[in-house]
Regions:
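Phosphate/dinucleotide-binding and metal-coordinating scaffold of catalytic cores
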Residues: 1-140
Length: 140
């Protein structure tokens, strides 16, 4: 339970919420979320967005939500965090071990392939294009 929140679906966006939505968009591509929509996002009084209902993830495909973010500059904080994570073998190993306790090996391997592919795109270019996102289909 997250107190003092409401459904985000009908709220207008601002700079702070748009940055968060871009990060959620990338996260959803990496975990292959097939059910992200405004109805499973909630927002608090400080404009902090929470992605809820993540049950349809790590599946055979992802939903192509938030198409307006293709080719837009992604937040510097996301680029920095992805760069740091991908440069840290120990952190990746720990995450892999934890995921292996919860998911089949093939899904964990696909997750890391998507993470590395998307992460490198973002680090190198700061954006993801629609064509590049279509490449994710080969990582499932």
């Amino acid at each position: 339970f997250i107190p003092d929140t409401e459904n985000f679906q009908y709220r207008p966006t601002n700079e702070k919420t748009e940055e968060q939505l871009k990060i959620i968009w990338v996260f959803d591509m990496i975990i292959f979320s097939s059910d992200r929509h405004g109805g499973n996002l909630i927002i608090d009084n400080n404009d902090q967005i929470y992605a809820i209902d993540n049950g349809l993830t790590f599946g055979p495909d992802y939903i192509k939500a938030y198409a307006e973010f293709y080719s837009l500059k992604l937040p510097d904080t996301l680029i920095e965090k992805l760069s740091n994570f991908l440069a840290n073998d120990d952190t990746q190993r720990i995450l892999k071990e934890l995921l292996m306790e919860l998911l089949p090996e093939n899904e964990v391997e696909a997750f890391f392939k998507r993470l590395n592919y998307i992460g490198q795109l973002i680090i190198d270019h700061g954006v993801i294009t629609r064509n590049e996102s279509e490449e994710l289909k080969k990582f499932n």
